[in-house]
């Protein structure tokens, strides 16, 4: 895999924006309400990907027992806690100290031992069996360097899972014009010009020595809400493994 630069990919303005949301991150009716609706959809994909990659524990309540997981851009721990419940030894990393503090507080209240760090993934050491980063790459200063840093943290037989909005007319309408315009997502959360299409993300993964596996869209319908789909035009989630 490509060796990542130690140059930071953190955007201080983005970190500050998300840090302001830390206090009610775990409130399903607060500023992160959309994440609470999105998280179960992500988890369905993540569980299927885990079962496909490590079939020995398929169907188990704790398929990640004995494995390490790193969630990059973890916020207040909305994904870290389910990964811990699946048995993983979890580390969560975020650029906003407010998020790390909120994550630590919630994990302690939930009786979960999760290692949270306010850090840049490019400056970390060690490797992990599972590396996840949900809706983060569109907020960094250098997507290629960010992917390379994630790849450096991935164990040779590990699994990476990424999700990000697609840069389409539909995503601009749904996520910025409508969702941010109506207050369903805090204003300023997204910069549509920084969204990556699958055709743009693929060569970044390949340059970092990774091969794409499963790819699904996350779509929305009035009847079904957010759900996994073959339609990648709004948001997509994928797996990658060392080539």
In which residue ranges do the predicted regions lie?
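N-terminal, positively charged/glycine-rich alpha-helical extensions of SAM-dependent methyltransferases
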Residues: 1-32, 40
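Conserved alpha-helix/loop element of class I SAM-dependent methyltransferases that forms part
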Residues: 37-65
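Conserved hydrophobic residues forming the short capping helix/wall of the S-adenosyl-L-methionine
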Residues: 50, 54, 107, 205
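Conserved SAM-binding loop
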Residues: 56-62, 67-170, 198, 238-242
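Acceptor-substrate binding/catalytic loop of class I
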Residues: 164, 183-200
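Short, flexible, mixed-charge acidic loops at enzyme active sites
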Residues: 171-181
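Short alpha-helix
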Residues: 193-209, 215
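Core SAM-dependent methyltransferase catalytic element
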Residues: 226-243
């Amino acid at each position: 895999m490509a060796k990542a630069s130690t140059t930071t990919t953190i955007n201080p303005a983005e970190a500050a924006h998300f840090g302001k949301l830390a206090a009610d991150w775990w409130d399903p009716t607060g500023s992160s309400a959309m994440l609470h609706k999105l998280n179960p959809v992500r988890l369905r994909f993540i569980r299927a990907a885990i079962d496909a990659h490590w079939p020995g524990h398929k169907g188990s309540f704790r398929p990640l027992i004995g494995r390490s997981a790193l969630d990059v851009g973890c916020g207040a721990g909305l994904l870290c806690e389910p990964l811990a419940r699946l048995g993983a030894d979890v580390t969560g990393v975020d650029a906003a100290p407010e998020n790390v503090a909120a994550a630590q507080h919630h994990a302690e209240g939930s009786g979960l031992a999760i290692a949270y760090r306010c850090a840049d993934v490019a400056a970390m050491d060690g490797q992990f069996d599972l590396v996840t980063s949900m809706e983060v790459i569109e907020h960094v200063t250098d997507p290629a360097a960010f992917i390379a840093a994630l790849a450096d943290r991935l164990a040779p037989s590990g699994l990476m899972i990424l999700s990000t909005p697609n840069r389409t007319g539909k995503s601009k309408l749904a996520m910025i014009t409508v969702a941010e315009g109506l207050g369903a997502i805090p204003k300023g959360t997204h910069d549509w010009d920084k969204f990556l299409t699958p055709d743009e993300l693929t060569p970044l993964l390949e340059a970092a020595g990774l091969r794409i596996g499963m790819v699904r869209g996350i779509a929305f319908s009035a009847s079904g809400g957010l759900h996994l789909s073959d339609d990648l035009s709004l948001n997509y989630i994928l797996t990658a493994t060392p080539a």
